[in-house]
Amino acid sequence: MNNLIKYSTFLISDLFDVVIGKTIDGNKAQRNENGTPYITRKATRNGFEFMIDGEKEKLYSGKLPVITIGNETSKPFVQEFHFFTGTKVNICIPKLDLNRNHLLYITTMIENATKMFSYSYTINSTRLKSLKILLPIKGEEPDWDYMNTYISKILSNMEKNFDVQQNDGVSDLRSLKDLSWSQFKMDEIFSINSGVRLTKADMKPGNIPFIGATDSNNGITEFTSSTNASFDGNVLGVNYNGSVVENFYHPYKAVFSDDVKRLKLKNYPNNKHVLLFMKVVILQQKVKYAYGYKFNATRMKEQIILLPTKADGTPDYEFMEQYMMRMENKVVGRTTEKEAD
């Protein structure tokens, strides 16, 4: 928090109209990959569950962007597209014309203010309306320019490390069922390196992502200027502690907690698409591990994973890359179509 900026508290009800979703059972709805997002109270993936075809009268089709907050999880997310959601999700509709950056700033303030809530004491719409959050001010009003600039700088620093999104060329159109699959130890596929312990007391504020053992925010738990031997990029960060087996791809340079292992491919150039394929493969092992049964380096090296293979029995990295390019192209195409509407 900037010590030169003045702050004041505001009620959520001063800033937002709070409504709840409609009665809808997403599990019974018709799933359609070209449908509309179904947002739930989950604390990950921006609340996104899957795409569905739902009844139009139950669609949130109002002002955008908005913030959604699940009752039990109290996790706020910014939604920029219209969506379906149920009665356990609160929709915060800005009373002013606020942009994504404003709402991203506010979600952080909401998270700071909702730590007292839990599954036994949920943040329903009544409690949410009376929730107080701390915001920077200019005079007596929220300093929207400061919030917008602050988030813009953070996003700009991160986006410098990403390639410009484009529709990748794909030549391999095989499906997963068309392939041969074989078992491999993770140690055959990856170099596995540890993170380094960095305590809050030793952590200095900055713009370098700090990767912790969380299941959300792409693993980012803080931003720091402190670096150590774990400073790395273009890797998979795999949690061996905390939210065990959860893993995220980090194209940007980051500092990694000692609860997170850094994985790089041994026999193929590290790239976003192959590592994202591996992310899903590794997540299939999550059911085996828990807080009392850590996914430590020894177990990680011996863990068996199933991968598509070539005729010679080696992993088909080229297919993995092409397959994830296809998935990415679908998302890029869908997003472009919605932005054009």
UniProtKB/Swiss-Prot annotation:
Cofactor(s) the record lists: Mg(2+)
MF term (GO), any: DNA binding
Enzyme class (EC, first level): hydrolase
Regulation of its activity: DNA restriction requires S-adenosyl-L-methionine and Mg(2+), and is inhibited by S-adenosyl-homocysteine. SAM may be a cofactor for DNA restriction.
Alphabetical list of InterPro entries matching this protein: Restrct_endonuc_typeI_TRD, Restrct_endonuc_typeI_TRD_sf
Biological-process GO terms, alphabetical: DNA restriction-modification system
Enzyme Commission code: 3.1.21.4
Keywords: DNA-binding, Endonuclease, Hydrolase, Magnesium, Nuclease, Restriction system
Reactions catalysed: Endonucleolytic cleavage of DNA to give specific double-stranded fragments with terminal 5'-phosphates
Function: The specificity subunit. A B, G, H and S subtype restriction enzyme that recognizes the double-stranded sequence 5'-CGAN(6)TGC-3' and cleaves bilaterally and symmetrically 10 base pairs upstream and 12 base pairs downstream of the sequence to release a 34-base pair fragment. Methylation of the recognition sequence occurs on the adenine in either one or both strands; seems to methylate restricted DNA. This subunit degrades DNA in a non-specific manner.
Subunit and interaction comment: Heterotrimer of two A and one B subunit. Both subunits are necessary for DNA-binding, which is sequence non-specific.
Family indicated by similarity: Belongs to the type-I restriction system S methylase family.
Protein's UniProt name: Type II restriction enzyme BgcI specificity subunit S.BcgI
Gene source species: Heyndrickxia coagulans (Weizmannia coagulans)
